């Protein structure tokens, strides 16, 4: 398993994996597959081109040269919120789950975030995905709130669990 920062050269596979994530786990993401299909690989390339290890990056997990998971991190740009970072878009392919991939991915994001001067907390949103919530708690994240009906998919609502890791 290889973990590394994604670059603009990874845009094609990142865009495809994001689409897979949105299709496989729609309740875990605010974006929909339909919305994602309105974007282009070039949009993903531009996002990855703007990666900055000090404030905004995406980490990919690779096994035998294939990307099997991703997670992103961003830090608030304004002075009053620079003490906060946020993890987004955590996804591991179904066939790679239960093998420690998500744990390794999250630990890498947290490791990189801990190196950032002045960062005091990392937040994330956990959906109804109980295995993900258990992983986040095992890594030291704690719940600080619940956003009821955060997402609406068709006629069903999804509540989000708000979590924080104090650094």
Each predicted region: which residue ranges?
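Conserved N-terminal glycine/acidic-rich loop preference
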Residues: 86-88, 105, 131-143, 148
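Glycine-rich acetyl-CoA-binding "A-motif" of GNAT/NAT acetyltransferases
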Residues: 66-69, 131, 157
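Active-site acidic-Proline motif in GNAT/NAT acetyltransferases
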Residues: 93-95, 99, 127-128
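Extreme N-terminal starter segment of soluble prokaryotic enzymes
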Residues: 1-4
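Conserved GNAT acetyl-CoA-binding A-motif
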Residues: 113-126
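Acetyl-CoA-dependent GNAT
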Residues: 8-9, 15-16, 20-89, 93-94, ...
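Conserved catalytic-core motifs of GNAT/GCN5-like acyltransferases
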Residues: 123-125, 137, 142-158
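Residues forming the Rossmann-fold NAD(P)(H) cofactor-binding site
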Residues: 99, 103, 107
């Amino acid at each position: 398993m290889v973990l590394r920062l994604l670059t603009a050269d990874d845009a094609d596979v990142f865009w495809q994996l994001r689409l897979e994530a949105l299709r496989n786990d729609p309740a875990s993401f605010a974006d929909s597959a339909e919305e994602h299909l309105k974007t282009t690989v070039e949009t993903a390339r531009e996002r990855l081109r703007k990666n900055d290890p000090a404030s905004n990056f995406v980490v990919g997990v690779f096994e035998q040269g294939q990307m099997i998971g991703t997670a992103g991190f961003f830090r608030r740009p304004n002075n009053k919120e620079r003490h906060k970072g946020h993890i987004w878009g955590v996804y591991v392919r179904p066939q790679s789950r239960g093998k420690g991939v998500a744990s390794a991915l999250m630990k890498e994001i947290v490791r990189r975030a801990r190196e950032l001067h002045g960062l005091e907390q990392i937040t994330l949103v956990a959906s109804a995905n109980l295995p993900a919530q258990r992983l986040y708690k095992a890594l030291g994240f704690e719940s600080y709130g619940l956003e009821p009906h955060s997402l609406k998919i068709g006629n069903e609502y999804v509540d989000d669990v708000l979590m924080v890791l104090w650094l």
